[in-house]
Regions:
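GHKL-family ATPase ATP-binding module
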Residues: 1-231
Length: 231
């Protein structure tokens, strides 16, 4: 920067610096036990620096405590994945092999099983017919995966494309969200949120139907022939 007669501030925006620091935090979170140091300097002057080390991925999630209700968080894990879900609006925070990857087959595989289970439960127990797709936005998820030879839709590795059957190199491994975890989800506030959404949706549809019927009734009245006295 000295040779260019520039400073860090003129070359990098504050938003860019924040993104770089977040990448450092994410790298430490996805690689438990690794020390990651972030240093933002200008002409040897330290402007901002931080060091990150997580003993567990749970400690990373605790950074979001102002946003996440950890008491309502549900968790499961197996040989290739750790997953946490909680009532929310459908955000995904995911990692694959230590790199941030919040879209793709790993996210959909977990969500599909949860969504299908909630949809089937509501139809059976509450007589509520709601599609799995409409369940999707009622909870958020943190996850970290170790996928064998992962493939992505681009070099930025933002979306995993590896098919579920190839997640593990263990021929005996079968991807499945545990039944015990599903049972806990069905007892959670997530289901209540889905039911509330469905009821609100029905109320809106009923109001639309009522307004339509009122318009039709008014139209019929206006179109009636004027009364003609028989005398």
């Amino acid at each position: 920067f000295k040779r260019l007669h520039e400073t860090v501030d003129t070359c990098f925006s504050e938003d860019f610096i924040n993104i770089i620091e977040k990448r450092c935090i994410d790298a430490a979170a996805a690689n438990v036990g690794l020390n990651v140091h972030f240093s933002y300097t200008d002409n040897d002057k330290v402007i901002r620096e931080s060091e990150w080390h997580f003993k567990t991925f749970d400690e990373y999630i605790e950074l979001f405590t102002d946003y996440v209700d950890t008491e309502q968080m549900l968790k499961f894990s197996d040989s290739i994945m750790q997953v946490w879900v909680f009532p929310d609006n459908g955000i995904n925070v995911g990692f694959v092999n230590g790199a941030e990857c919040s879209r793709g087959t790993h996210i959909r595989a977990v969500r599909n099983e949860i969504n299908n289970a909630i949809s089937a439960y509501l139809l059976s127990k509450e007589k509520i017919d709601i599609t799995p797709k409409n369940v999707d936005g009622k909870y958020s998820m943190f996850c970290t995966f170790h996928v064998n030879n992962p493939s992505y839709d681009s070099q930025t590795k933002e979306c995993l494309t590896t098919v579920v059957e190839k997640f593990s190199n263990d021929s005996k491994y079968t991807f499945k969200v545990p039944d015990a975890f599903i049972k806990n989800v069905l007892k959670s506030e997530i289901v209540d949120i889905v039911i509330d959404w469905y009821k609100q949706k029905c109320e809106v549809e009923d109001q639309k139907t009522l307004r339509k019927l009122n318009r039709q009734a008014k139209t019929k009245i206006r179109n009636n022939d004027k009364f003609i006295d028989a005398n």
